[in-house]
Amino acid sequence: PENQPDHFTPNDTISGTVRTGLAGTFTVGGVSPDYTTISGAIADLVFSGACDTVVFNIRNGTYTEELDIPYETIATGAVVIFKSETNNPANVIITRNYTTGSTNRMIEITNASHLRFNDLTLKVTGTVCSSVVYMNSYCADIQFTGCNILGSTCNSTSTSGAVIALVNGQMDDIHFESNVIRKGSYGLYVSPGFSSFANDLVLEENSIDSAYRYGAFLNRIQGMHVIGNTIFSPTTSSNGIET
């Protein structure tokens, strides 16, 4: 410094970890997979980010996991796809059994975006009301297509038993298309909060049945598209759609 020799060099360097972002197709489960668990694939995605579209082909089997998907870095124009390798939801079952607790969430998506879930069976079982899919904070561009999204029996009006819950933050471009949504206190519960909205929510060609309170409760939504859905209410205490 100041044209003099530096006799103390330990503070002259920095270090960090650099990893290449994910891109391309990866396998989960089965023989010689890229990832043995779905949770492992998500952890790598969160750590590395995605520099292009990523497809996680999930091989046939039952995966007993609880999935937490937080904010992830995904390149502009790219998406991350979780799908059955055979494109048959009966072949890939992601499940979790709950017997205690009041805020159980098998798949929790927090402040995340650009996700696709295709042709999967997502299922909770057990003796307490639980959610299969729970989105909160700001979530955008997330689609569930061709999935069986199956809650447990929940004879309660509690929102903690909603099969799918979108709450506590703005939601943009969330799509549910051609899914089977079953049981729970609500099939779908959307309530972003007093200061937020769900924008451009799409519900198309879904079969929603056996929810205890409402097939779909839709609150504070701008630009809603509800087309060709079938809602079956099994008791006189349950209703179809509430807005």
Describe the function of each predicted region.
Residues 1-22:
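Extracellular/luminal regions of secreted and cell-surface proteins that mediate adhesion/ECM remodeling
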Residues 24, 52-54, 65, 72, ...:
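The right-handed parallel beta-helix/beta-solenoid scaffold, focusing on the short coil/turn
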Residues 70, 96-108, 127-136, 155-168, ...:
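Extracellular beta-strand/beta-solenoid scaffold signature
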Residues 113-124, 140-153, 170-185, 197-214, ...:
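Right-handed parallel beta-helix
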